[in-house]
């Protein structure tokens, strides 16, 4: 069995190389060793420089675990790692509480809650953070999920969409939640549209739901069982049946007109013969 130091070194190399699957394999035996050495859960009553230094290393291990979990879309694992980091990040020990990854991981945790539509816990956590971190929104990373939540609550979907489209401030881990949150925005707009309209032109739906083309819009409409008739999207069967009936009536009128025209042509031809 490799030592804790050897396992930690292998973890660091795997993470730097972007081998997140290897990170996930290394982390369980590392956590076992941390538990054996009373390091996984910090005992802040121990005021020993060596122990505190070991806790700093443990914090970095947990941060790697959290970030690797995001990269592999293992959000349950990410949440577990973040909860294990909380005693460090919100410790009274300044050295333990500081980290260059702290703002990023807190933001990812808040985005994870938003992606689950867990707004109650999101706002509860926000209140907790507000007590422990001054001027939350002055931090460019922390302000990202806060703005997103505010605009979603206000129904300012264009602003929320633009923020998601902005490339998540070049934080690649944020992109793990982008598609989920975009889908949530589309679903919310779709629900409101269904309640407000009987039908809308396909081109309007494309613009409303931020689609790039009508083919994507048609696919979305069919997934929601929205009938499409003559480039119009219908949101209830009654409206669709009415559209079908009107379409059928127009077709019958065209047929009648065609028959009458043929009859008139025939009558004129007979008259000319006589």
Swiss-Prot record:
GO terms for cellular component: nucleus; proteasome complex; proteasome regulatory particle, lid subcomplex; proteasome storage granule. It comes from the Eukaryota. One of its GO terms (biological process) is proteasome-mediated ubiquitin-dependent protein catabolic process. Transmembrane segments: none annotated. Keywords: Proteasome. InterPro entries: 26S_Psome_Rpn12, CSN8_PSD8_EIF3K, PCI_dom. Residues 76-251 form the PCI domain. PROSITE patterns: PCI. The keyword DNA damage does not apply. Acts as a regulatory subunit of the 26S proteasome which is involved in the ATP-dependent degradation of ubiquitinated proteins. Necessary for activation of the CDC28 kinase. Present with 9890 molecules/cell in log phase SD medium. Belongs to the proteasome subunit S14 family. This is 26S proteasome regulatory subunit RPN12.
């Amino acid at each position: 069995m490799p030592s804790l130091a050897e396992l930690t070194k292998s973890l660091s190399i795997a993470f730097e190389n972007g081998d997140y699957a290897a990170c996930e394999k290394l982390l369980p035996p590392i956590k076992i060793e941390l538990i054996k050495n009373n390091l996984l859960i910090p005992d802040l009553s121990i005021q020993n420089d060596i122990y505190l230094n070991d806790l700093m290393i443990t914090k970095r291990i947990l941060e790697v675990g959290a970030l690797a979990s995001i990269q592999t879309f293992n959000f349950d694992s990410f949440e577990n790692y973040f909860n294990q980091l909380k005693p460090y990040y919100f410790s009274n020990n300044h050295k333990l509480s500081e980290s260059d990854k702290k703002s990023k991981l807190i933001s990812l945790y808040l985005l994870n809650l938003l992606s689950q539509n867990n707004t109650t816990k999101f706002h509860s956590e926000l209140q907790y953070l507000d007590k422990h971190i001054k001027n939350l929104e002055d931090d460019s990373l922390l302000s990202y999920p806060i703005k997103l939540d505010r605009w979603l609550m206000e129904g300012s979907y264009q602003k929320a969409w633009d923020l998601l489209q902005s490339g998540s401030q070049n934080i690649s881990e944020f992109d793990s939640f982008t598609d989920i949150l975009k889908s949530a925005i589309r679903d919310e707009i779709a629900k409101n549209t269904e309640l407000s309209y009987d039908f809308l032109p396909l081109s309007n739906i494309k613009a409303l739901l931020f689609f790039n083309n009508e083919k994507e819009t048609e696919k979305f409409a069919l997934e929601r069982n929205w009938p499409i008739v003559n480039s119009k999207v219908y949101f209830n069967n009654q409206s669709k049946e009415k559209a079908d009936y009107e379409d059928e009536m127009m077709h019958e009128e065209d047929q009648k007109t065609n028959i009458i025209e043929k009859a008139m042509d025939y009558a004129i031809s007979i008259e000319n013969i006589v």
